[in-house]
Amino acid sequence: ASQQKVDLIVFPELITSGYELGLRFTELAQRVPGPTVNLIAQRANEYGVYIVFGMVSKEKVESVLYNSAIMVGPDGELVEVYNKIHLRGEERMAFREGYKLPVIDTEIGTIGLMIGYDLAFPEVARSLVLDGAEILCVCANWEAQAIDEWKTYMRARAYENACFMVGANRVGEDVTITFGGESMVVGPRGQIHTSLALETDPESGAPLEGFAVARIDLDEVRKYREEFQQIQNRQPTVYKSLVRRY
């Protein structure tokens, strides 16, 4: 990818550990910044790119773990940390929920970070967009048996918000879960700019590792937001139930 002079690279969720680790998450968790972040930041500096990747992070209190998305920049510095807000299943026993949705202004565009199951909640993408995001990066470990959800959510969030979605989804297997791959870049009208959907094993049909590169034009975001008015025509005064605690 670096040979094609890319500006932004996105990796899947929890790339330094795997997904089904239970108590072993505590062993593999690192502080941020720490050895893994520093190593990837060095690579970002070496190739002059932004890198977003998922890992297990921990606070000074050793028992407090987060499922995190880390962004490092071309200057080799830590840019942002996002801790996954929407945890599902056994994640809830391993991780603490995050509580902030950071938006990062960069010279390549304004970027928001999401992780996996966050994608199922339209409020996350909309909140990031209302705070200025033009590109939403999603680090994911989406299961193969639910891959239609992944594809639908990625396109839906792009349509709803007239933004670019950059989603990296894991392939392979953990203890009981098979992951669905199909990483993709989706444009503000739901058009798929690039996808790894066809990167499959010829015998089993299972998704394979790979990477895809797309060139995007942020003028499309401004054009379609002006044309379709998804943001301007909102009526937030009638959406009170969205923020009511049930």
Give the location of each predicted region.
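Cys-nucleophile CN-hydrolase/nitrilase-fold catalytic domain and related Cys-dependent amidase chemistry
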Residues: 1-75, 81, 143-163
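Short beta->alpha transition motifs characteristic of CBS
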Residues: 17, 70, 82-88, 184, ...
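Active-site catalytic loop in hydrolytic enzyme cores
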Residues: 32, 42, 60-134, 139-152, ...
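CN hydrolase (nitrilase-like) catalytic-core segments centered on the catalytic cysteine
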Residues: 32-52, 110, 120-213
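Short helix-loop capping/hinge motifs at secondary-structure junctions, enriched
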Residues: 77-80, 191-193, 221-222
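A short, polar/charged loop-to-alpha-helix boundary motif
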Residues: 84-97, 199-227
